[in-house]
């Protein structure tokens, strides 16, 4: 694996093979913790890794079942507790050695490291318990490691605020790396200084300077900043520390110090560290490469003790191979506790490093990443692969052009979505092309003064912001994607809403304050403006902003009344009063309709999935783009340099001169009055300007298209948010009761013009005409997310529903009849013309559902109440052609009084529905009484025979006649759906009577065997309900009509309307009080059946509207395994074309049979099909239905029983002998098979003849 080299001054040559490691999903944290801890304690007890017996090198063994166990010798050592005492004696010989486990536990308790289980401290009995309690032993080992680390690092200096040993060790490593960085930069500057006079007096010619130090810049190392144990995962910090103390053993050129560290690079560095520890440290390196790479939280103590051993080796023991490198400011291991200097020359030097401000330090003044830290470092709770490798690696943001690499932005470009969705780390491709105005040439010299520290947050701080609920601090100068509400700085220093720029433009940033603004999700006062867009709060909007052209596709509305967070966060908000928002809306806020909000949430979740998929694809393309840029040399960037400077200047001039971007992607005046210098905040522009390679143009176009698609999806989600806000907002009309209000986060008002009308008043408002209120935007209110991604304008509009009255009916449609469409047609166009307000040529909508009957769209215009309440409303009342299934604004010209009439009609319809539900409930009770009386009368008349056929069929007519008034009263208002329901009930009544009439005939003429047996089984008529309800789709009349003869309760009407019954109709007001009050057609009083026995959801779907309330105890009724047998025959017993005729014959027999339980007869345990039997529930005899076998099988003949597993398509033998409803197959005793025994003697007897 490693080819060692002599430690001479010559170059070290090491050959490494990339080792095979376990992926993160296969890496077992608990197993890794046990292995590392046992290896450490064994090495500590035996005085070094070389003294451990070979049989104990691997503490685990694998048994024949592939299960890992601790080896018995290790177990014996742990149970005797001798191992711990020997480890104490070897590691701390100057201290008193505890003689027994109790003394050891007392000693650890005195030192403050009490080993504890999750619920209590470890006792001596736990250490001697058999079988071994590994958790107790691991707790003792952790306490030993902590005690040893404290003892070894007594001389470790550090800031007084750092009370944790982990913090002090990380501070030591970070300080050592910082000093090494300064030393390296000084050496690079000295090497570059002799070449400076060759440039002449032309500092404005950066190309010559780049040529001179091209070799140096190409090999410039990027030193990491260490703020947590996660930063050690790349191995760069540890390897650099080893180089500082042992430069002759590990040269700096041997260490991989790159900015985007791949897994192979990290493994290379970690192998260097592992080899050094194994060869130089007394206890070696008990951690595996996976442990060092993934840095799991359970191994935190193990990593800390490894750092402590390194410190003891380098600073306390100081063996011969430790030859400390001469670093600036004295000794490397003597960091100044309170005056640690910040890294120098970290902007444009040959070894660029950007130091992120540590999350636990105060924000004032330059400081070291760990100075003044209080509290504990928070390690990331997420262990995803990317985050485990480089969660807190720091990225350099202002590099030379020759070093354009990927960097990690702690907040994504759309940070409000990323924070909610839990994806705070997105690898973005950064390029210095067209990121800002051209900078002067000295900005790239190695002696550039450092920028102000504390510009961007660390990943840990981003996670802290995500996982903390109280008001949080946003890091100074956070990336533009990081959005926050209501900065304490006021409107003077607003933040950009989006880091995306329109193509061909460059957007300067305002200077960020050093004090971090406070992130307040729920502002208390609406007086402070929200820094939504540059120039929004401090400057009045341009006149062109009021035109639809400027606002039609703008993702962020200027002067919006309420600033909303992301769509995902919005679902978690409570219903808030809107009084303090200054909008004049009513104060009563009833709860929003749950069904409507759930549908909207489901649709938004699908849109979110699409957005994340496009974002992931965009990140992949950006990664490819970054790698491609890294492969380019200095000469390619030199060609780009002059064009970039001119292009950026033109872009800046264009931005200053132009008004709003076409399509309203950027408000007018956004760049006015802004400084031309760009600070350290980063933006990402899809258009990267001229590039030296054709491939870069393709990458740019792909990234731009994906970014455009992503922004359009997010605009769709925002329009969904606005639509839901309008639909659920309370009305303002006087004299009308307010409907359920929307979820509102009270926000600021930016001026007198900012108070837009209430969302409820804007329900039918349009994109094209301004509303009745003094709003600047024709589409108000726009509760946009400040971090909306903005790109080239796309003609993409999600138009809300035409009429709010159609929305309560959405819950009455089924996915089968009206599919909820979530198509999101994405226009990936590079140059899209601005959207014309009148023509709307490229209108793309995301339909929320279908609009219904063409007869009901003119609500509020004098249409009758019946037409208003129809379930099927048309998309357009103005005669415009209907496009797809989208909702469009068509009623934009209706005045306010018509809107008030609409609201009043909506309330009236709701009252009418409640009254109608009460009437329907009363009518159902009357109908049940009539059915009970008719059933009793028919039961008495059935005794003579089939004579009641003449009198029973006409009896079906009184019930429809009696229902006629109710039908006339309710039908016109309910529309087609209600009429179908009443017709279905009439059919149900007819079929019930026909079923009862034909039952005696079926019992008398159904065959000698089955008919007689059925006559003695009064309960058999109720057994098919649930089974037939689960039956696969067949012909509407043919196969189901035969079920009348099998006394099925599933009537013809429910079969013919089965598709309509699956509509998911929800009528909570028409629910029956209890399922026991419903009378199934086949439940006759003379059949001695109990109502609660046979409650089946398939008996009458029209009259049993999905009761979900409390139920009485229900005895389990006999269910059918017909379809399990069907599945077994089709996929297991008689699968394939060869057996298809036999399978079809048997399936026909199953369909003809009236039995509920079928069993397959196997020849023997090899499960060879022989016959199909039916089980009699009373006699427990099996009767052959088809196949070969005994005609009747008694329980004494059964040898084995089997159950079929539909998922695994196989039979499993049950260790029982009793037949039950869960048995699907059986075998009989071998001597009962008489088929082949007579044939063998015949052959033998025929040979003498």
Swiss-Prot record:
Domain CKK: 1109-1243
InterPro entries the record matches: CAMSAP (IPR032940), CAMSAP-like_CH_dom (IPR022613), CAMSAP_CC1 (IPR031372), CH_dom (IPR001715), CH_dom_sf (IPR036872), CKK_dom_sf (IPR038209), CKK_domain (IPR014797), PRC_barrel-like_sf (IPR011033)
Keyword field: Cell junction, Cell projection, Cilium biogenesis/degradation, Coiled coil, Cytoplasm, Cytoskeleton, Microtubule, Phosphoprotein
Segments of skewed composition (Low complexity): 189-205, 341-352, 594-604, 754-779, 950-964
Compositional bias annotation for Polar residues: 364-383, 814-825
Basic and acidic residues biased stretches: 568-579, 889-940, 970-998
Signal peptide per UniProt: none
Top-level taxonomic group: Eukaryota
Bias kind Acidic residues: ranges: 647-657
Transmembrane region(s): none
Biological process, per Gene Ontology: cilium movement; DNA replication checkpoint signaling; embryo development ending in birth or egg hatching; epithelial cell-cell adhesion; establishment of epithelial cell apical/basal polarity; establishment or maintenance of microtubule cytoskeleton polarity; in utero embryonic development; microtubule anchoring
GO MF entry, a single one: DNA binding
Residues that bear Phosphoserine: 193, 334, 341, 347, 351, 368, 373, 382, 547, 554, 560, 685, 769, 814, 1074
GO CC terms of this entry: axoneme; ciliary basal body; cytoplasm; microtubule minus-end; motile cilium; replication fork protection complex; zonula adherens
Localization (cell): Cytoplasm, Cytoskeleton; Cell junction, Adherens junction; Cytoplasm; Cytoplasm, Cytoskeleton, Cilium axoneme
Stretches of the chain forming a coiled coil according to its record: 594-628, 696-729, 896-935
Skewed-composition ranges (Pro residues): 437-454, 731-741
Residues where Phosphothreonine is found: 184, 799
Domain-related comment: The CKK domain binds microtubules and specifically recognizes the minus-end of microtubules.
Additional free-text comment from the UniProt record: 'Nezha' is a deity in Chinese mythology.
Quaternary state and interactors: Interacts with PLEKHA7. Interacts with CAMSAP2. Interacts with KATNA1 and KATNB1; leading to regulate the length of CAMSAP3-decorated microtubule stretches. Interacts with AKAP9; regulating Golgi assembly in epithelial cells. Interacts with MACF1. Interacts with AKNA.
Function of the protein: Key microtubule-organizing protein that specifically binds the minus-end of non-centrosomal microtubules and regulates their dynamics and organization. Specifically recognizes growing microtubule minus-ends and autonomously decorates and stabilizes microtubule lattice formed by microtubule minus-end polymerization. Acts on free microtubule minus-ends that are not capped by microtubule-nucleating proteins or other factors and protects microtubule minus-ends from depolymerization. In addition, it also reduces the velocity of microtubule polymerization.
Name recorded for this polypeptide: Calmodulin-regulated spectrin-associated protein 3
Biological source species: Homo sapiens (Human)
Gene name, Swiss-Prot/TrEMBL: CAMSAP3
């Amino acid at each position: 694996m490693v080819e060692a080299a002599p430690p001479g001054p010559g170059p070290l040559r090491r050959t490494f093979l990339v080792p095979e490691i376990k992926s993160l999903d296969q890496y077992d944290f608990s197993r890794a913790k046990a292995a590392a801890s046992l290896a450490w304690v064994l090495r500590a007890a035996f005085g070094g890794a070389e003294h451990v017996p070979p049989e104990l090198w691997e503490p685990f063994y694998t048994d024949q079942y592939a299960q890992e166990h601790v080896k018995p010798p290790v177990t014996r050592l742990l149970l005797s507790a001798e191992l711990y005492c020997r480890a104490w004696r070897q590691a701390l010989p100057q201290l008193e050695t505890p003689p027994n486990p109790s003394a050891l536990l007392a000693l650890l308790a005195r030192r403050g490291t009490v080993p504890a289980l999750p619920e209590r401290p470890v006792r001596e009995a736990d250490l001697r318990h058999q079988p071994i309690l590994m958790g107790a032993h691991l707790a003792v080992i952790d306490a030993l490691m902590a005690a040893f680390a404290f003892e070894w690092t007594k001389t470790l200096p550090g800031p007084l605020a750092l009370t944790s040993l982990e913090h002090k060790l990380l501070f030591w490593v970070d300080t050592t790396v910082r000093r090494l960085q300064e030393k390296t930069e000084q050496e690079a500057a000295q090497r570059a200084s002799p070449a400076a006079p060759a440039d002449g007096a032309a500092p404005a010619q950066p190309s010559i300077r780049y040529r001179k130090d091209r070799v140096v810049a190409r090999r410039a190392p990027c030193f990491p900043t260490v703020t947590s144990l996660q930063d050690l995962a790349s191995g760069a910090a540890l390897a650099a520390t080893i180089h500082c103390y042992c430069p002759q053993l590990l040269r700096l050129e041997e260490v991989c110090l790159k900015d985007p560290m791949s897994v192979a690079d990290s493994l290379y560095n970690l192998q260097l560290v592992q080899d050094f520890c194994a060869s130089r440290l007394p206890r070696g390196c008990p951690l595996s490469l996976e442990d060092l790479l993934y840095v799991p939280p359970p191994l935190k103590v193990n990593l800390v003790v490894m750092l402590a051993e390194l410190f003891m080796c380098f600073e306390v023991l100081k063996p011969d191979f430790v030859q400390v490198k001469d670093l600036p400011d004295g000794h490397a291991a003597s960091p100044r506790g309170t005056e640690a200097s910040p890294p120098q020359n970290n902007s444009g030097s040959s070894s660029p490093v950007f130091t992120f401000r540590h999350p636990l330090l105060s924000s004032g003044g330059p400081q070291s990443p760990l100075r003044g830290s209080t509290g504990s470092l928070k390690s990331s709770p997420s262990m995803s692969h990317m985050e485990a490798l480089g969660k807190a690696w720091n990225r350099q943001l202002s590099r030379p052009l020759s070093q354009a690499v990927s960097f990690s932005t702690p907040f994504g470009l759309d940070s409000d979505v990323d924070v909610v969705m839990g994806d705070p780390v997105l690898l973005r491709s950064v390029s210095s092309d067209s990121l800002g105005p051209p900078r002067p040439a000295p900005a790239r010299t190695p002696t550039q003064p450092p920028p102000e520290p504390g510009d961007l947050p660390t990943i840990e701080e981003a996670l802290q912001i995500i996982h903390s609920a109280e008001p949080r601090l946003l890091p100074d100068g956070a990336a533009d994607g990081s959005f926050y509400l209501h900065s304490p700085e006021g409107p003077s220093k607003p933040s950009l809403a989006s880091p995306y720029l329109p193509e061909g433009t460059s957007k300067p940033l305002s200077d960020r304050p050093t004090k971090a603004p406070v992130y307040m999700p729920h502002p208390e006062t609406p007086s402070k403006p929200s820094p939504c867009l540059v120039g929004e709060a401090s400057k009045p909007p341009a006149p062109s902003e009021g035109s639809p052209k400027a606002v039609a596709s703008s993702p962020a509305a200027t002067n919006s009344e309420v600033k909303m967070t992301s769509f995902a966060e919005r679902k978690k908000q409570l219903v808030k009063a809107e009084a303090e928002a200054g909008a004049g809306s009513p104060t009563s806020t009833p709860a929003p309709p749950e069904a409507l909000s759930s549908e909207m949430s489901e649709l938004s979740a699908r849109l979110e999935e699409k957005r994340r998929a496009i974002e992931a694809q965009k990140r992949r393309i950006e990664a490819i783009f970054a790698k491609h840029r890294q492969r380019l040399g200095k000469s390619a960037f030199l060609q780009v340099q002059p064009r970039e400077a001119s292009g950026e200047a033109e872009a800046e001039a264009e931005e200053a001169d132009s008004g709003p971007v076409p399509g309203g992607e950027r408000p007018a005046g956004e760049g006015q009055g802004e400084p031309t210098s760009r600070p350290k905040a980063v933006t990402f522009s899809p258009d990267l300007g001229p590039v030296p390679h054709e491939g870069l143009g393709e990458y740019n176009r792909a990234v731009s298209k994906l970014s455009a698609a992503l922004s359009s999806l997010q605009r769709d989600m925002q329009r969904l948010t606005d639509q839901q806000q309008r639909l659920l907002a309370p009305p303002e009309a006087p004299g009308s009761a307010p409907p359920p209000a929307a979820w509102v986060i009270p926000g600021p008002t930016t001026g007198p013009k900012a108070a837009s009308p209430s969302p409820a008043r804007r329900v039918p408002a349009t994109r094209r005409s301004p509303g009745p209120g003094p709003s600047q935007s024709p589409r108000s209110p726009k509760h946009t997310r400040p971090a909306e991604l903005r790109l080239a304008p796309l003609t993409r509009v999600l138009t809300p529903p035409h009429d709010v009255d159609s929305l309560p009916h959405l819950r009455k449609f089924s996915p089968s009849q009206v599919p909820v469409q979530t198509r999101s047609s994405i226009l990936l166009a590079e140059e899209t013309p601005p959207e014309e307000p009148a023509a709307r040529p490229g209108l793309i909508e995301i339909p929320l559902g279908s609009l219904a009957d063409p007869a009901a769209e003119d609500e509020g215009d004098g249409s009758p109440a019946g037409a208003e309440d129809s379930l099927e409303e048309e998309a357009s009342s103005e005669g415009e052609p209907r496009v797809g299934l989208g909702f469009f604004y068509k009623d934009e010209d209706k005045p306010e009084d018509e809107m008030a009439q609409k609201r009043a009609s909506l309330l009236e319809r709701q009252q009418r529905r409640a009254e109608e539900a009460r009437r329907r409930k009363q009518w159902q009770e009357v109908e049940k009484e009539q059915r009970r009386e008719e059933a009793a009368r028919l039961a008495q008349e059935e005794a003579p025979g089939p004579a009641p056929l003449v009198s029973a069929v006409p009896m079906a007519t009184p019930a429809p006649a009696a229902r006629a008034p109710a039908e006339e009263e309710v039908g016109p208002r309910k529309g087609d759906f209600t009429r179908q329901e009443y017709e279905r009930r009439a059919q149900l009544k007819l079929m019930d009577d026909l079923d009862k009439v034909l039952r005696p005939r079926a019992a008398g003429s159904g065959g000698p065997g089955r008919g007689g047996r059925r006559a003695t089984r009064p309960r058999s008529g109720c057994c098919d309900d649930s089974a037939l309800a689960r039956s696969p789709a067949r012909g509407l009349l043919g196969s189901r009509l035969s079920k009348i003869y099998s006394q099925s309760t599933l009537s013809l009407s429910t079969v013919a309307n089965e598709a309509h019954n699956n509509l998911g109709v929800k009528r909570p007001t028409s629910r029956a009080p209890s399922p026991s009050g419903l009378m199934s057609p086949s439940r006759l009083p003379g059949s001695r059946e109990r109502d609660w026995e046979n409650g089946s959801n398939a008996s009458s779907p029209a009259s049993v509207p999905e009761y979900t309330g409390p139920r009485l105890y229900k005895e389990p009724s006999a269910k059918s395994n017909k379809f399990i047998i069907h599945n077994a025959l089709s996929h297991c017993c008689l699968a394939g074309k060869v057996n298809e005729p036999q399978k079809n014959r048997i399936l026909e027999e199953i369909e003809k049979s009236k039995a509920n339980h079928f069993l397959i007869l196997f020849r023997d345990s090899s499960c060879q099909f022989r016959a199909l039997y039916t089980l009699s529930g009373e006699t427990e005899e099996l009767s052959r239905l088809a196949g070969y076998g005994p005609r009747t099988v008694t329980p004494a003949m059964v040898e084995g029983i089997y159950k079929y597993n539909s998922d695994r398509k196989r039979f499993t033998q049950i260790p029982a002998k009793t037949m039950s409803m869960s048995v699907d197959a059986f075998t009989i005793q071998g001597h009962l098979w008489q088929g082949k025994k007579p044939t063998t003697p015949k052959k033998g007897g025929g040979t003498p003849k």
